[in-house]
Amino acid sequence: MLLASFDRLLLTNGYEDVSVRELTANADVGRSTFYEHFEGKHDLLEHSVARVLVVIAAAAANRTPSDALLDVLTHVRAQRALASALLRGSTRAILIRVLALKLERQLAALARRSAAPPIAPPIAPLAFLALSLAQAQLGAIDAWLSCDDSCDVQTAARVLHATTRAGVVAVFGSSG
């Protein structure tokens, strides 16, 4: 109920104008109950997108586009208005930060494997690389949502995966 109310308010008011007071009233949830679970609306936003972003981040380690990535992109396309609002508004920076943290974990796992050839050590700090990949991934999704429906979900998944993997290969070499 709370997440559904949050989504509705994001679409109608925009993120900046969503207040915890309005959100809890709309969801018929007490403010104290809200704060038992979330520190504030930023925390709620992070929670609401976490499952989607963890799948997108996994593209860094997966050798092929996963079924989970197809499912996530299908969901994103079905929720195009909400996704576009999140990708283009003040929330984009939050999404980038959360995705970068998830990507950094993926890259750290690859870096641990880099002690044994043929994977090369990373060429820059992982936080910087993860942030760059996060911006590229969300940019690709935003571009896909901006296009007409001629680009299907499978194509979008292949492009997102290929561009993410190209970044990983550039950082770690061909076996990354």
Protein language model features and the residues they cover:
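Amphipathic alpha-helical interface segments
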Residues: 5, 9, 136-143
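C-terminal peripheral helix-coil segments that are non-catalytic and often amphipathic
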Residues: 112, 143-176
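Short, hydrophobic secondary-structure boundary micro-motifs
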Residues: 18-19, 84-86, 95, 153
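An amphipathic alpha-helix adjacent to DNA-recognition modules
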Residues: 3-7, 11, 16-20, 25-28, ...
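Amphipathic alpha-helical packing segments from all-alpha helical-bundle domains
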Residues: 67, 71, 92-118, 124-139, ...
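Short, surface-exposed loop/turn segments at secondary-structure junctions
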Residues: 86-89, 119-124, 150-154
